[in-house]
A protein has these predicted regions:
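Carbohydrate transferase catalytic cores enriched for Leloir-type hexosyltransferases
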Residues: 1-375
Length: 375
């Protein structure tokens, strides 16, 4: 198969869907088959993907664009580029595809927040993405979601034929593991000015992640005499000022640390240094950070919503969304009970081994084959 991959949505600092783009392309390129991959990407794409030199990938480097102008380019210029490469199929990795294409197409939907929680997106994104996603759902030969939860949401919200939409869970990179190297840990601690004992959150600082709930529960933990600090890892998204303001309002500026964006190379060590990982999100299409935390041997607390029970299973604590009391109680339990901590560490590592990028690529390739056999 000659497969086109639209990776032009890959941002300079990948998180979430950006990591999916990187890891899927790496796994597809490493697979032992005769497929030819043609990757459409902006200028930083090859460096971010960091494929081995011997990997046979045809690069189509396009002009760097802002997210808004990229979407216009996708509709107006990408079809002509695709036609010139003579690919059998184009896989669009981030919600949308060109309205006109000279080949079969597959589109990945990461979540359905544009329909379920539109208030969690900027006005510009609310204006564009719902209609573009509906059009992609109609026009694509097949759709991929990253969890069964998102698949069911898409079927219900977009009236999609269930036979047209497939689930390919995300994976966890082998670099996310227990690390015993004290020198490396000291280096990362100094680099990000991390405290000795801390509760960790990782993700964009934005409304969907529901960080005020965590900050309020943590305030109660401080009032209870905890010595653990709270470390919030991730780039500032829209409305991040609300979180900073709440930290100041609750007089937690000396107890809460903001690191900003942390590179993928450093993340495994940051996880390894944490005593507990908390992910209080309102909705997730998958929730990759909880899987990475479990692989690194960190107990996990998250919300009983959308894909998270599907990913975590019995390997962590799930609480109701927006329940500060439940989050506080769960944090007290895990931090205060070493036997329980060790149990969650063991179960989490076992659970994380069920997910791999090789499996993601294998299932994705099966979708390609089915599309080309029936189109």
């Amino acid at each position: 198969m000659r497969i086109g991959i639209d990776a032009t949505a890959l941002p300079p600092q990948p998180v979430g869907a950006g990591n999916y783009i990187i890891q899927l392309i790496r796994a597809l390129a490493a697979a032992d088959n005769d497929d030819q991959l043609v990757v459409f990407t902006q200028s930083k794409g090859p460096a971010l993907l960091d494929l081995p030199e011997e990997t046979s990938v045809e690069w189509q480097i396009v002009k760097d664009r802002t997210p808004g102008s990229r979407l216009i380019w996708e509709q107006t210029r990408l079809p002509r580029l695709v036609q010139g490469t003579k690919v059998d199929l184009l896989h669009s990795l981030h919600y949308t595809r060109p309205m006109r294409l000279p080949c079969a197409s597959v589109v990945t939907f990461h979540d359905m927040t544009f329909f379920l929680y539109p208030q969690l997106h900027t006005r510009a994104r609310r204006m564009f993405f719902p209609s573009a996603i509906r059009a992609s759902a109609r026009q694509a030969d097949a759709l991929i979601t990253v969890s069964e939860s998102t698949r069911q949401d898409a079927i219900r919200l977009l009236a999609i034929d269930p036979g047209k939409i497939f689930t390919t869970h995300l994976g966890v990179d082998p670099s996310f593991r227990l690390i015993d190297n004290d020198d490396e840990k000291k280096t990362i601690t100094a680099k990000y000015d991390l405290p000795e004992n801390f509760v960790l959150y990782l993700g964009t600082i934005e409304p969907r992640k529901n960080l005020p709930i965590l900050v309020r529960a943590y305030r109660r933990l401080v009032d209870n005499g905890t010595s653990y600090k709270l470390v919030l890892v991730g780039k500032y998204g829209w409305m991040y000022e609300d979180v900073l303001g709440l930290v100041k309002e609750l007089d937690l500026e000396d107890m809460v640390c903001f690191t900003g964006y942390v590179s993928q190379d450093d993340l495994p060590l940051v996880y390894n240094l944490a005593s507990l990982f908390v992910y209080p999100t309102i909705y997730e299409g998958f929730g990759l950070p909880v899987l990475e935390a479990m692989a690194c041997g960190v107990p996990v607390i998250s919300t009983q919503i959308a894909s998270l029970p599907e990913i975590i299973g019995d390997a962590g604590i799930l609480i109701p969304v927006n329940d500060v009391d439940a989050l506080f109680d769960a944090m007290v339990r895990v931090l205060g009970d070493q036997t329980l901590r060790e149990e969650f560490i063991r179960y989490g590592q076992l659970r994380s081994k069920k997910f791999s990028w090789e499996r993601t690529a294998q299932l994705t390739r099966q979708v390609y084959q089915q599309v080309l056999e029936t189109s």
